[in-house]
Amino acid sequence: MPDLTGQLNRTSSYATSFGGLSDIWRCIWHKNGSNTQVAVKSIRSQALDEKDVKKKNRRLLRELKVWSRLRHDNIVPLYGTVSGFGQFVSLVCPWYDNGSLSGYLESHSETLSIIRRFQLLSDVSAGLQYLHSCSVVHGDLTGSNVLISSDGRAHLSDFGLSVIAVEFVGMSYFTSALNGTVRWIAPELLAIPEEEGATAIPTPNSDIYSFGCILFQVLTGKPPYYEFKRDAQVVVAISLGTQPSRPELPVIFDHHWSFIKDCWSIKDRRPSSQQVDEYIKSQLYFLQHDTSSPD
């Protein structure tokens, strides 16, 4: 995996955006005489001694090596790593001008047709199935970790990083959920572990729950649990077994709502990523060939 240290220039003195556990920098990569816009993601952490930093960097690089080998149209490519943006090595990926799925839906929700929405969902389901076929669990599938390219395609990013970030910062999923991802996290990951110090580990089943939340978000233009303004309220709702409520508007067709509920069922009864991808693509095919459906 290439070390791009010394090949990047920051476009500003400060990070462009801040995630729950990381910072994003917009940079220019000087490559073979041309300039390419890239995003540099650095994992935030508390102060560590040099020995601990080296140990965690080795762990991070092992995980990133898996990402660097992945090749799929709906997976954000990892160009390499870079030092100098924090205590740990940082990731270098393409810069997506259309930003995240959440931001894209906020900006375009009024104009997106049902076909266009299912095209986005088809991209997400295809990327997720590919990850699972490579024995990779995403672990943090949210509207912020799906990026939209200039041609309007959706690409999955940051898979596997949530577990590392939680380890590095030394917190549980329950605590990290309050950093803005709780609306997409499977309930079993928020359960208080029986053993002290143990932490819940994401699985393909928990990814499917999160996909159900993405499906909800794309069809409605609203995040799951939109009726609650604060994430702490969402945590309480999940602890009580309350699932996101079905909005009156926009209308979600019964068969789509039924499939969302399947994704939110108890973990052993959720569909596989292959079944999810087949369902989404069958719905897209039907919409594209239904003469009564709006474009």
Where are the regions that the model predicts?
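Activation segment/activation loop of eukaryotic-type protein kinase catalytic domains
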Residues: 149-183
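Catalytic-loop of the protein kinase fold
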Residues: 132-149
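Conserved catalytic-loop aspartate of Hanks-type protein kinases
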Residues: 207
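Short beta-strand micro-motifs within the conserved protein kinase catalytic domain, predominantly
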Residues: 77-89
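Activation segment signature within eukaryotic-like protein kinase domains
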Residues: 120-121
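Glycine-rich ATP phosphate-binding loop
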Residues: 23-48
